[in-house]
Amino acid sequence: MTSVQPVPRLVEQFERGLDAPICLTWELTYACNLACVHCLSSSGKRDPRELSTQQCKDIIDELERMQVFYVNIGGGEPTVRSDFWELVDYATAHHVGVKFSTNGVRITPEVAAKLAASDYVDVQISLDGANAEVNDAVRGKGSFDMAVRALENLSNAGFTDAKISVVVTRQNVDQLDEFAALAARYGATLRITRLRPSGRGADVWDDLHPTAEQQRQLYDWLVAKGDRVLTGDSFFHLSGLGAPGALAGLNLCGAGRVVCLIDPVGDVYACPFAIHDKFLAGNILSDGGFQNVWQHSELFRELREPQSAGACASCGHFDACRGGCMAAKFFTGLPLDGPDPECVEGWGAPALEKERVKPKPSGDHSRGTKQGPVALKLLTKPPARFCNESPV
C-alpha cells in the first residue's frame, strides 16, 4: 500500500521557496517629484540605464509565462515614466494584474476615470500623516494636499477600494484612528507598514522609528482595530507582545522565498527593503531572464535553506517573530542571526548601543544634497522639494 505523504504547512512551503513569487515588487524608475526623507530606494533622479519600454514588456511576457498573478509597481514615482500607462495596459492584457504606489501627482480626474474602468489595477496612495503638518514634514510641502486630491478623484470616478499606505513613525502613530477615518471617507483600505532603515531611511531611522512604548501602542491598536487593515509582513517582529496568532499577517521573512524586487535597471534583489549588493541575486538582462534568477540564483538558494535561530534560539518568542526583519538588522549594522533592532524583549536596544559598522548604500539617486536627520519633534518648516522640474 502506497503511503500518502503529508502536505507541508503553508509556512513550510513558503520557507522552501515557490516556483514564482507571490509578491513581486518592480521599481520602474528612480525618478521622483518628491524627496521623502525616509525613501527606501533613495529616489529622485532617473537612472540613464533604466529599462526600455520593450525590455519591460519582455519581462511582463516572462511573468505571464511564470503565472505571476500581479506586480507591485513603485519607484521613485512610477507615473512620471512616459510609457507608464502603456505598460500597465500591456500587463493587464497579458494576465498580470498591477498594483502601483503613487504620491498622486498624475491621478487627475481623467486618469481616475480610466482606472475605475479597469478590473485588474489597484492604486495605492502614499500618506505619512493624517494632516499636512505631519505628512509634509516627511514627504515635502504640498504632498498631503496632492495625495488627498488623488483620493478624491478616485472616489469621484467610482474607483473602489483604493489603498492608503502609511509608514508608521514616531510622529504619526497617534493618528492611526485618523488614518482609518480618512480611508473610510474615500472608500479606501488602510495599509500600514514598518519604517525600515533602508535608503534615505537609514539617515532618519533613529529619530523616526516608534519608541518601545509606541510599538506596544501600535500592537494593541492592530489587535483591537486592525481586522480590515493591511500589514503584510511588516509587524511580525511585534508578535511576542501577545498571544500567538493574535496579530494578523505573515510571520515570516519572505525574502527570496515568496518576495523579491526588480529595480529600474533589471537588477533582482531578495527584498524590496534590502536594496544593497549583499542581497543582489542577479540581473534580468545579463543572467538569462527573471525566471532563471528566481529559480537558480545562489543567493535565493541560500535563503531557502533552513535558517538557524542564532542568538535568538533560547527565546520563547522566536517561533512567532522569527528573529525579525533581515533588512532592519542589516542596515542598522546588527548581525543577521541576532535580534531585530526593535525586538520586543528589549534585546535590540543594547545591541544598537554597541560599536557597529553600518553598511554604505549601494546607490543614491537623491536630487541635490541629502536632508539631514529630522528632529524628534515635528519640523516647524517642511523640507523643500528638491525637484520642481520634470525628474525624467
UniProtKB/Swiss-Prot annotation:
Spans annotated as Disordered: 354-377
Assigned keywords, A-Z: 4Fe-4S, Iron, Iron-sulfur, Lyase, Metal-binding, Oxidoreductase, S-adenosyl-L-methionine
EC numbers: 4.1.99.26, 1.3.98.7
Family: Belongs to the radical SAM superfamily. MftC family.
Pfam families: Radical_SAM, SPASM
Name of the gene this protein is made from: mftC
Cofactor note: Binds 3 [4Fe-4S] clusters. One cluster is coordinated with 3 cysteines and an exchangeable S-adenosyl-L-methionine. All three [Fe-S] clusters are required for MftC modification of MftA.
Residues in Radical SAM core domain copies: 18-228
Role of this protein: Radical S-adenosylmethionine (SAM) enzyme responsible for the first step of the biosynthesis of the enzyme cofactor mycofactocin (MFT). Catalyzes two reactions at the C-terminus of the mycofactocin precursor (the MftA peptide). The first one is the oxidative decarboxylation of the C-terminal L-tyrosine of MftA, forming an unsaturated tyramine moiety. The second reaction is the cross-linking of the tyramine with the penultimate L-valine residue, forming a five-membered lactam ring. Its activity requires the presence of the MftB chaperone.
Record protein name field: Mycofactocin maturase MftC
Residue sites binding [4Fe-4S] cluster 1 per the record: 32, 36, 39
SUPFAM superfamilies noted in UniProt: Radical SAM enzymes
Tree of life domain: Bacteria
